[in-house]
UniProtKB/Swiss-Prot annotation:
This is Methionyl-tRNA formyltransferase. NCBIfam families: fmt. The gene is fmt. Its EC number is 2.1.2.9. The keyword Protein biosynthesis applies. GO terms for cellular component: cytosol. It comes from Trichlorobacter lovleyi (strain ATCC BAA-1151 / DSM 17278 / SZ) (Geobacter lovleyi). One of its GO terms (molecular function) is methionyl-tRNA formyltransferase activity. The keyword Cell wall biogenesis/degradation does not apply. (6S)-5,6,7,8-tetrahydrofolate binds at S112, L113, L114, P115.
Amino acid sequence: MTGWRIIFMGTPEFACPTLQTLLDRTENVVAVFTQPDRPKGRGQKLQPPPVKELALRHGIPVHQPPKVRTPEVIEQIRALQPDLIVVIAFGQILPKALLEIPPQGCVNVHASLLPRYRGAAPLNWCIVNGETETGVTTMLMDVGLDTGPMLLKKTTPIAPDEDIQSLHDRMSQLGAELLGETLDGLKTGRIVPEAQDDSQSCYAPLLKKEHGLIDWQKPAVTIHNQIRGLSAWPGAVTSLGGAPLKLYRSSIGQGAGTPGTIIATGKNGIEVACGHGSLIIHELQAAGSKKMDAASFLAGHPLALGTLLMPHEVTA
């Protein structure tokens, strides 16, 4: 196999379509670096990252250093003589010494329209903040957090009721397509890197459980966006009778009342008054139960009108 020697760095399912694109193009992927296996599930059994599984199926050597910034790992990467390193959702910050190894640089596939939504959770925060459009950017990495020169972008609309899982799946494919176009442009010299305008930047910090706490004093549209943006994790949560209640799917209503009060129930959902407007809950999950639609929930948990949903408190 000829062409640029490429090292791929990525970890979750989101990164797999991009690695698959490199394989489909018969690029010379000489190694894959990914996070160590992690314990998961009730049995806490070690589970390999999805990227590792894909790489091994194709016979690509896999490396899983806990930290890539150590001198030993940097020398290991140098010995592989990469022309280019492709990074997507890797989960570790690359040090300057590593970034300087490949002559063609390190290309990152970032799930936002940079310079907006730099950081760890751009897709979630785009939805939570009510954005109607997002996209993917390829960039040449520098030592900053998603601050390097931009190469190419692809945009995509966000539907008013789209949730994080749907957007995640679409964007993973979009990123893979853009990486292919970026490689073509770099190899032919057609791409001129563009500096980011830092004055237009905003950040998408790592998600915490606290981000899922619902405040019924807020407008219904704000809570609706919170639910669809955080449905995968940590989940939008309120409290019913002192127990946590996770909300997974909702729509916006026109009702009014004391914020947090249940003002209507039926097959269509459970309607709750908010600071402005109302929220109709269509899918939810009580503690110790399965996720279910509102009608199924009401069959086992009849709710009187006027019942108050309270703020939930996060426990360590």
